[in-house]
């Protein structure tokens, strides 16, 4: 008995057929699709995160040149409000949308009607065809992701009519600048100008353009559809050079978000393999930022349109980034990391707080048999210091999301006497953490840079300053001067002070020193709550003392002033106790840079006519979050200098051994076993004179001698 023939394949693209390798691929049925949202239209479609309200489609059979029935369906949106642009172009109202079907039911009707039309026309598999990429990439896929809908496979490949038109007519403008009207005009097609049904004219015109392309001299074939990736592919970044036009920076991410959450935020756009790199701060914790690498520049441009779209209740800022920034975060994969990340489709978890004595068997026992690690011991990666000491961190691989969820339930479970934290992680985070501990530089701990000497601020309690709050983070001094308008003429020289946060980024605050109290009050009354770059800015009077406190790291709020962290008792000028008279190894000009206890000899005997060293007074304090001064003619000082001891504090002027400020080098983190030769080898190429060996001064433990190898040195 002969078995019955197999059933015909369902409508949709056949994954077994690779059209890119077939020299003469079988033409597929085309479904011309048009859609609109309740917000922006045209090139900005989907940029405002509004819901889909309309779908119009029609089937075209390329072989017989026949077309099916034109269908139009309204979609009920969660937010019924229509933008003025949409209301004018579509003629729809909130009442008509309220009676429409939901998106999931409309998609079911779409699949049923398209399958019926394709069968009537004698076609087989079909592919969507749209005007541009916004409808699928920026509207349908993101909205389906937000509403937890599963789109049919047919929505993961499509033809961009603009690109297909540009292939046959390359002399026209770029594909990105084409529209349905310009394509019809270039082909000399007559369109129905009386058609006023929104979306119908666009679909009819697109069908006419497609039929004209099919009947062209070369018989244009729609053979290479655009592909939308269904899932994000994890893995190490192996590229040494990354195109600057393919990278964006996402800011404001929830700290617990993973690379899969970031990929879901950019649903519909093709992210390169291993292209999500979550950024870490100096402590190795996530700072709410990520660098994302896309497959091409067009995907990156579409990603920039998702600026201030939402991930849950948080809006995410999206900015341009460079390939160099991405390589710094995601690159530099070692052999150990590459081997660990070589397994694809694995979920990575990070374990933190492990006992230093814990081994692979202890971690596997902690996780338990209900959530096995992929590969057992091979699926664990322990983070260690360069000398082999454990850091208490480890990474584990799990085969699926269910096993990872089971492992996350062990969060803050006990291993020995310590509780263990478990978090979702990414391949880029594995690389960053391992790179942080992979190698130790010759001088591992660098001293903080010396800041320029701040411009002296006049004392007084008069409210002759104004404070600007809520500035855009991109605001410059020129923007502030333009914002103040006529009041900018009353600013004192060097009177504009921008405030940075602890990460060195603008905090949105600034202080302006005015010529008088009256001018400051007038500027505050005139400019309070004026708008700068779509943000209103608060302008309130304040005193110079309040400004100084904030610039030094304190805070100013309605509850009053809080002192900055640097305002400690040791920072005020001490009593002038004299030291033992001895040859000065470190001149008085540089003693203000180091703690006085580190510079004192072991014995202290009162003596006269010796230099006195103390911390700089309030007039020369380091303004830790001060950034820039408003330049006045000729220019503000820009050179970096040292804080010097006031001349009145010197009983006598010793002979300085420093010919210039740059001759002072401080070495921190020197091994206890380091000797004189080890220190001199560091400065081998800097021509340290033999008679200058005595200028190696131990710091930090006065009772030790040079031969006892102190922890810290000052080299002169």
Curated annotation (Swiss-Prot):
Coiled-coil annotated residue ranges, if any: none
One BP term from GO: regulation of RNA splicing
UniProt function note: mRNA splicing factor that regulates the formation of epithelial cell-specific isoforms. Specifically regulates the expression of FGFR2-IIIb, an epithelial cell-specific isoform of FGFR2. Also regulates the splicing of CD44, CTNND1, ENAH, 3 transcripts that undergo changes in splicing during the epithelial-to-mesenchymal transition (EMT). Acts by directly binding specific sequences in mRNAs. Binds the GU-rich sequence motifs in the ISE/ISS-3, a cis-element regulatory region present in the mRNA of FGFR2.
Protein's recorded name: Epithelial splicing regulatory protein 2
Compartments, record wording: Nucleus
Family as reported in the entry's similarity comment: Belongs to the ESRP family.
Superkingdom classification of source: Eukaryota
Listed GO CC annotations: nucleoplasm; nucleus; ribonucleoprotein complex
UniProt-listed InterPro entries: ESRP (IPR050666), Nucleotide-bd_a/b_plait_sf (IPR012677), RBD_domain_sf (IPR035979), RNaseH-like_sf (IPR012337), RNaseH_sf (IPR036397), RRM_dom (IPR000504)
Gene name linked to the record: Esrp2
């Amino acid at each position: 008995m002969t078995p019955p023939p197999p059933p015909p394949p369902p409508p949709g693209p056949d994954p077994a057929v690779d059209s890119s390798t077939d020299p003469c691929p079988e033409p597929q049925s085309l479904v011309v699709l048009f859609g609109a949202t309740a917000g922006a239209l045209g090139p900005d479609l989907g940029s405002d995160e509004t819901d889909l309200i309309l779908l119009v489609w029609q089937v075209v059979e390329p072989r017989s040149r026949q077309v099916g029935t034109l269908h139009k369906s309204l979609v009920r949106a969660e937010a019924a409000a229509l933008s003025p642009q949409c209301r004018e172009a579509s003629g729809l109202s909130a009442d008509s949308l309220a009676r429409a079907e939901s998106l999931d039911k409309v998609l079911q009707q779409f699949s049923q009607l398209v399958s019926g039309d394709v069968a009537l026309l004698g076609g087989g598999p079909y592919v969507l065809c749209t005007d541009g990429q916004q409808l699928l990439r920026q509207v349908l896929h993101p909205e389906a992701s937000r509403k937890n809908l599963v789109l049919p496979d047919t929505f993961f490949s499509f033809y961009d009519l603009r690109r297909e038109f540009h292939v046959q007519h390359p002399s026209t403008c770029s594909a990105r600048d084409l529209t349905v009207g310009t394509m019809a005009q270039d082909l000399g097609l007559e369109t129905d100008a009386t058609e006023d049904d929104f979306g119908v004219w666009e679909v009819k015109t697109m069908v006419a353009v497609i039929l004209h392309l099919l009947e062209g001299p070369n018989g244009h074939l729609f053979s290479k559809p655009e592909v939308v990736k269904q899932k994000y592919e994890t893995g190490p970044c192996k590229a040494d050079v990354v195109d600057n036009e393919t990278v964006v920076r996402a800011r404001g991410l929830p700290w617990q978000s993973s690379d899969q959450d970031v990929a879901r935020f950019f649903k519909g756009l093709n992210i390169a393999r291993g292209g999500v790199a979550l950024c870490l701060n100096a402590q190795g914790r996530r700072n709410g930022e990520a660098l994302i690498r896309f497959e091409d520049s067009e995907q990156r441009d579409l990603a920039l349109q998702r600026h201030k779209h939402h991930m849950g209740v948080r809006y995410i800022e999206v900015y341009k980034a460079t390939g160099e920034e991405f390589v710094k975060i995601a690159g530099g994969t070692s052999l150990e990391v590459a081997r660990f990340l070589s397994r694809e489709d694995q979920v990575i978890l990070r374990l933190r707080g492990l006992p230093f004595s814990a081994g692979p068997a202890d971690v596997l026992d902690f996780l338990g048999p209900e959530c096995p690690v992929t590969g057992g011991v091979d699926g664990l990666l322990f983070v260690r210091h360069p000398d082999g000491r454990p850091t208490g961190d480890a990474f584990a691989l799990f085969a699926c999301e269910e096993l990872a969820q089971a492992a996350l339930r062990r969060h803050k479970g006990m291993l020995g006497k310590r509780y263990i934290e478990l978090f979702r992680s990414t391949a880029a985070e594995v690389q960053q953490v391992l790179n942080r501990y992979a190698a130790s530089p010759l001088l591992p701990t660098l001293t903080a840079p010396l800041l320029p000497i701040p411009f002296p601020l006049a004392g007084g309690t008069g409210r002759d300053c104004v404070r600007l709050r809520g500035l855009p983070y991109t605001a410059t001094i020129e923007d502030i001067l333009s914002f103040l308008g006529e009041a900018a003429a009353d600013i004192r020289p060097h009177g504009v002070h921008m405030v940075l946060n602890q990460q060195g980024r603008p905090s949105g605050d600034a202080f302006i020193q005015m010529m008088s109290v009256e001018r400051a009050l007038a500027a505050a009354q005139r400019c309070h709550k004026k708008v700068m770059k779509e943000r209103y800015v608060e302008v309130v009077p304040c005193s110079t003392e309040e400004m100084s406190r904030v610039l030094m790291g304190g805070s100013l709020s309605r509850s009053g002033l809080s002192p900055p962290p640097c305002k400690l008792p040791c920072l005020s000028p001490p009593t002038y106790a004299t030291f033992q008279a001895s040859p000065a190894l470190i001149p008085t000009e540089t003693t203000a840079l180091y703690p006085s206890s580190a510079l004192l000899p072991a014995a202290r005997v009162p003596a006269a006519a010796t230099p006195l060293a103390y911390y700089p007074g309030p007039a020369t304090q380091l303004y830790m979050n001060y950034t820039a001064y408003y330049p006045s003619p000729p220019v503000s000082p820009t050179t970096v200098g040292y804080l010097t001891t006031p001349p009145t504090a010197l009983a006598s002027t010793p002979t300085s051994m420093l010919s210039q400020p740059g001759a002072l080098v401080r070495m921190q983190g020197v091994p206890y076993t380091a000797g004189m030769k080890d220190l001199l080898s560091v400065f081998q190429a800097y021509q340290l004179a033999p008679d200058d060996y005595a200028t190696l001064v131990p710091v930090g433990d006065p009772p030790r001698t040079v031969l006892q190898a102190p922890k810290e040195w000052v080299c002169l």
